[in-house]
Design a protein with these regions (language model features):
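Extended soluble regions of mature proteins
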Residues: 1-233
């Protein structure tokens, strides 16, 4: 759902509500009726501190060799959420190439673009100029803020922060993306309707919690617990 620079998305990782004007967002576990709220710019630090707390609790009574193993895993996560230096961004040459290929996706004509990083094809995007989102969503700001909370996997965070990549939002809304691992994300349906402001707010019976508690619930769900209450919806 998108309206007045508010965005709501739901998936396997939970429910996200983004407020571009306040540069804040909400991450909710609806089955547990809990949520975390914070600023885009503070998420990486908050995530790091929460994960550090959880790992510390988990490893405190483990043998030394297992502590080393988990600390190594933790360091890899730290690296994924560490903001790269400007020199790292500048060292990557990002080039956007337009093509003459078009395709209808969810009823909208979409043009294919290719993203090359240091001469290597890293991503393909199908972008539609036919969806009138400009009055409801600042696409460039949304893309930049989303980059603040996404992990830096295989250099994605770096090139997605380049001016050439962010300027691609001027071409329209991304209807399909395929990365260099073949992972595809695609829009399957577009509807235009008036959305109540309350749809972008947490219900009164939801409890605000720390990010560490929300992560614990996510880890419980991914560990294979079969109960509905302990899994992400």
């Amino acid at each position: 759902m998108i309206q007045s620079n508010l965005v709501k998305m739901s998936g396997l990782d939970g429910t996200f509500i983004f407020d571009l004007e306040k540069e804040s967002f909400i991450l909710a576990n609806e089955p547990k009726k809990v949520y975390w709220e914070g600023k885009f710019g503070e998420f990486r630090t908050s995530y790091y501190e929460a994960l550090k707390l959880i790992i510390g609790e988990f490893t405190k009574d483990l043998p030394q060799d297992q502590k080393v193993m988990y600390n190594t895993m933790f360091q890899e996560t730290i690296d994924m959420y560490a903001a790269p230096s400007q020199s790292a961004i500048d060292s990557m040459k990002t080039e956007i190439k337009s093509t003459d290929m078009t395709e209808e996706i969810a009823g909208y004509k979409s043009s294919r673009y290719e993203v090359y990083v240091n001469g290597v094809l890293r991503e393909q995007l199908w972008v539609s100029a036919g969806i009138p989102l400009k009055k409801d969503l600042d696409m460039k700001k949304f893309a930049a803020l989303m980059n603040e909370i996404e992990p830096n996997i295989n250099g994605e965070y770096v090139y997605e922060n380049s001016d050439s990549y962010l300027n691609l939002t001027n071409a329209g809304f991304p209807m399909r993306t395929i990365d260099d691992l073949g992972i595809m994300v695609e829009v399957i349906k577009v509807e235009e309707q008036k959305i109540a402001r309350s749809d972008f707010e947490m219900p009164a019976d939801f409890k605000k919690v720390g990010l560490d508690e929300l992560i614990r619930l996510a880890m419980i769900g991914s560990a294979g617990d079969d109960s509905e209450d302990d899994s992400w919806e």
